[in-house]
Amino acid sequence: MNWTRGKTLGRGSTATVSAATCHESGETLAVKSAEFHRSEFLQREAKILSSLNSPYVIGYRGCEITREPFHNNGEATTYSLLMEYAPYGTLTDVATKNGGFIDEARVVKYTRQILLGLEYIHNSKGIAHCDIKGSNVLVGENGEAKIADFGCAKWVEPEITEPVRGTPAFMAPEAARGERQGKESDIWAVGCTVIEMVTGSQPWIGADFTDPVSVLYRVGYLGELPELPCSLTEQAKDFLGKCLKKEATERWTASQLLNHPFLVNKEPELVTGLVTNSPTSVTDQMFWRSVEEEVSEDRSSWWECHEDERIGVLSWIGHVVVESTWDLDGEDWITVRRN
């Protein structure tokens, strides 16, 4: 594919995101690029995304290795992932442009479409996304929700020891403990994302939840649950109850949730006329600020650690300071390793 890179829209610690135009079709693309020697996770994301084909997953358009200027480092060998352009930004953007939250009718629509995307990657591809949240779900040209940012995703079969990755506020109890992370963890994150859409806020709020350590400990070891918004209908609360089961094996699957009364026969017409600033898409700076480097720990002693030490690892212990306030769209996902 021949394409021309446009304006730089955002930078993370390893990647730069630009708009681009395909010469042959004139299609606007989103291009995520990293220096080749630092592109391991971008290549992993490209490998996973290239295997997917669903209207509820952001579209893969290709990948390339080129020699070009990169940041202020002069000319460098660059790895680029080309993706579909989504004109209405993220669900977080949609909430912001609509007064800070999304009405329940559209929450139903978006939730159903997220689950259709998860049903596809879970059942047909054996993939867990591992970082479902509002800022990782885009709104496409026809108003449909599309799962994006597969940087934390992994294959769940066969079960291979993998780092636990994701955003602390959306982590399931088993992931918060650093034990495992699979399809069930995505379902927990769907519940948290519904709360985020309805309230316009992270699923954990209040003076007791001002840092990731507190939330990880209380979710992983004290068994606490996010508070359900009182404005929700009983059906919505029941739906969230099926997502936010403490035991992973008790959570409903994506397929089961698609048949829950909260979602059945309630999808409204596709949203049109959304207010947007150009360019607003998968290339938005808000979306791409979450591009980070993996933080790794030696796996050999993980299970020998006391639970307090394991929470320390989960809170970026060692060389990253945990801020006192949350930034859901910033540098707030973590990596831990286990045997």
UniProtKB/Swiss-Prot annotation:
Its main location: nucleus. Gene3D superfamilies: Transferase(Phosphotransferase) domain 1. GO terms for cellular component: nucleus. It is found in: Nucleus. Expressed in roots, leaves and flowers. The keyword Mitochondrion does not apply. Disulfide bonds: none annotated. The active site is at 131 (proton acceptor). One of its GO terms (molecular function) is protein serine kinase activity. ATP binds at residues 9-17, 32. Keywords: Abscisic acid signaling pathway, ATP-binding, Kinase, Nucleotide-binding, Nucleus, Phosphoprotein, Serine/threonine-protein kinase, Transferase. It comes from the Eukaryota. SUPFAM superfamilies: Protein kinase-like (PK-like) (SSF56112). Residues 3-263 form the Protein kinase domain. Autophosphorylated. It catalyses: L-seryl-[protein] + ATP = O-phospho-L-seryl-[protein] + ADP + H(+); L-threonyl-[protein] + ATP = O-phospho-L-threonyl-[protein] + ADP + H(+). Changing residue 32 to R: In KN; loss of kinase activity but enhanced growth associated with larger leaves, higher weight, increased chlorophyll contents and increased seed numbers. Delayed leaves senescence. Its EC number is 2.7.11.25. Interacts with ABI1. Binds to MKK3. Associates with SRK2E within the nucleus. Component of the abscisic acid (ABA) signaling pathway that acts as ABA signal transducer in the context of abiotic stresses. Triggers MPK1, MPK2, MPK7 and MPK14 activation in a MKK3-dependent manner and MPK6 activation in a MKK3-independent manner. Mediates the ABA-dependent activation of the MKK3-MPK7 module. Positive regulator of ABA responses leading to the induction of gene expression (e.g. RD29B and RAB18) and involved in various responses including stomatal development, stomatal movement, inhibition of germination and root growth. Promotes leaf senescence. Belongs to the protein kinase superfamily. Ser/Thr protein kinase family. This is Mitogen-activated protein kinase kinase kinase 18. It comes from Arabidopsis thaliana. The gene is MAPKKK18.
